[in-house]
Amino acid sequence: ALPKKLKYLNLFNDGFNYMGVV
């Protein structure tokens, strides 16, 4: 499992990827 900090960074990155798609 990833540390919490990395998990949130990954969610943040996914959010940017989603915005780039939309």
Curated annotation (Swiss-Prot):
Keywords: Antibiotic, Antimicrobial, Bacteriocin. This is Bacteriocin serracin-P 23 kDa subunit. Disulfide bonds: none annotated. GO terms for biological process: defense response to bacterium; killing of cells of another organism. Major component of a prophage tail tube. It comes from the Bacteria. It comes from Serratia plymuthica.
